[in-house]
Amino acid sequence: GSGNYLLAEITPWQDVTEMEIFPYTESISGKSFTVTMKRFVPAREGIRYDRVFSKWAVVKVDGDKQVLDSHARYADEVAPKASPAALPLRNKKGFGAGDTDLYFSDCKEMNVGSITMNVVLNNYITGEGSGYSYGGKEYSLGPVKDYVDYVTQKASETGLVVSAIILCQTNSIFKDPENKGGNYTMPNLTTAKAFNLYAAALEHMASTHCTQGNRISHWIMHNEVDFANEWTNMGDQPMMRYLDRYIKSMRICYNIARQYDQNASVLGSYTHCWTVADGNYAPKKMLEATVAYSEAEGDFRWGVAYHPYPQDLTKPSFWVNDTQATYSLNSKYVTFKNLEVIDAWIRQKENFYKGKTKRVLFLSEQGTNSPSYSESDLALQAAGGAWAWKKVSKLDGIDAIQWHNWADNKAEGGLRIGLRTFAEGSVSNLTPKPVWYVWKAAGTAEEDSVFDQYKTTLGISDWDCILNTVE
């Protein structure tokens, strides 16, 4: 159109929809244009800035204002620094986070293909100091750096695909200025200095663990963002403002990790809610909005890390109790009962990466509970594990399931969702539960001989009858 137009560069610490003046611009003219600039800015707001993190928009000059005239767009391609071959999943079976010798022994004995790993970022990089340089700043590395080295090394010995869960504790250097508590915070991305700290931690981790050996293959960004106030707190926000920040966090990680591994995905973390917002937001709406963001700002390989716990985490009989987990794309919940729903959603072409490639879908945290260590409660838990595996093994949209927890944990509010016990009464610590044997048999020649004893508990005569068509 007629008038004076500029190409505006928007940094991660700027909110494009709230700006009236864009400080970083280039003049443009004509219906099409080419602008060439250096990738690195030696000094911008106190840091050495890499434009790989910027998005770009056309703005129209209107008097003393600059009016947004297009969607902002990220770079479609980032030049790789390394190109390792993909580390394939050998099967769908996995474990949630663990780090002991017995844990890795179980990984090998059960032939699991994948694990998760919690990374508390404020203990990976502890703030400005010495030892690591990024963006013109010096930082100190913390003890979690050695922990990540250890877990990824152990995982590489048996070919495990590792997904790192990126967490920022609330009272830490990463605390968002609008945070109001919760277990974890949305990382602070409101200033150049705060952004640089976050990017520094991810850059160090990716440059160390995205190439051959000691590999992180996927990045689960924060935890259960639909329950934002509890698990990734940014204060009380409209969904789209919260999601905009979350997508920025995902993009920062993505644009770093993909320089070292072109097979990496970043995964959004969600609870068992679907169209209902038991927390702050409904996951289905958040995912649909993320698809829309990708269409407007340029698609990237994001995926889903879903947590299909039973509706009531304490009750193992989800096949009876989960009445609001239906076989509809508008189901209120997605639990072990109706995994077909999220499988159907991820396989819809309108949700594919660039309309061509299915996104990664991991069930990255879930388990059935044994309310006690009685024989009947343990049988209910094991039956639920068998049901879950039978569904996952048949649903092509689900790439892997990481059972949480590997072992029962007394810090989990009375839940006993692990494959092994904690010490209680006559029960020894880390005793394999019946569900341990179910998980070991899953995907092997012994599967049916171990699983079939639980048909009576589930009230079925045939495993095929648990699979349903989504409306």
Question: Which functions belong to the PLM regions below?
Answer:
Residues 1-84:
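Beta-strand-enriched, solvent-exposed domains that form extended recognition/catalytic surfaces
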Residues 68-120:
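Boundary/entry segment of secreted carbohydrate-active catalytic domains
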Residues 241-375:
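Noncatalytic carbohydrate-binding groove/subsite architecture in carbohydrate-active enzymes
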Residues 147-162, 208-215, 252-264, 293-300, ...:
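A structural motif corresponding to the C-terminal end of an alpha-helix
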Residues 133, 211, 215, 225, ...:
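Aromatic-rich peripheral "rim/lid" segments of glycoside hydrolase catalytic domains that contact
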Residues 110-276, 311-312, 408-413:
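Substrate-binding cleft and catalytic face of glycoside hydrolase catalytic domains
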Residues 96-109, 198-208, 281-293, 379-391:
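Short, acidic/polar
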Residues 90-94, 114-116, 159-163, 216-220, ...:
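Structural preference for beta-strand elements that scaffold enzyme active sites
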